[in-house]
Amino acid sequence: MKFLRVGNIGSEKPAILDNHIIRDLSSVIKDIDHTSIGDNLINTVKKLDISKLPQLDSNLRIGACVSNPTKFLGIGLNFLDHALEQNLEPPKEPIIFSKATTCVSGPNDDVIIPKNSNKTDWEVEIAFVIGKKGKNISLAEAENYIFGYCLVCDFSEREWQKNRSGQWIKGKSADTFGPIGPYIVTKDEIKDLYNLNMSLDVNGKRMQTGNTSKMIIK
């Protein structure tokens, strides 16, 4: 299943992708957020004939695939090729950082470069969308808490992040620095999570290529 949100900023509708047709899920859930994401949503949708759901205009803006996420955490320097190109030792422990949830935006929305920014940068990432609360979760049980995956473009202001003291969050959290989407792909549709190609283009020029097989912390 592929879940997404479409419409103007602040009035997005929950939707599901039916092949290439966007179907309205407003009759099923109010929004795609921490209150609706989970096994119950998947089980409910499985019982539906989604071809009978209203079709939405394919030209509608695609919003962030998750509304108001409660946390936005990242793992820094987690691709081996990225670490090596910077002549850095691959980390033995995960480098965990946070982005303010207010930086979340739609995948095609404009990114606003902050005033006085000198080193705005970008990285394509894959995100794990957590589907239920948990604590002290064992590695063997961890996958049971994953609802699905989505793409993230992790924007950073590198000077603020690296050249000034303090936590990374100040260089990671400017408004629009967290485009996510276009949709959440449920985990059952990903056959091999650690063999996915990813790429990023800037103004039509390919700037990044990689594969999830190069992830260090898995």
Where are these regions (language model features)?
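Short aromatic-centered micro-motifs
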Residues: 15-16, 128, 200
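Catalytic-pocket segment enriched in acidic/His residues
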Residues: 5, 9-10, 46, 52-57, ...
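Short beta-strand segments
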Residues: 7, 74-75, 98, 123-131, ...
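Structural signature of FAD isoalloxazine-binding scaffolds in flavoprotein oxidoreductases
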Residues: 89-107, 120-122
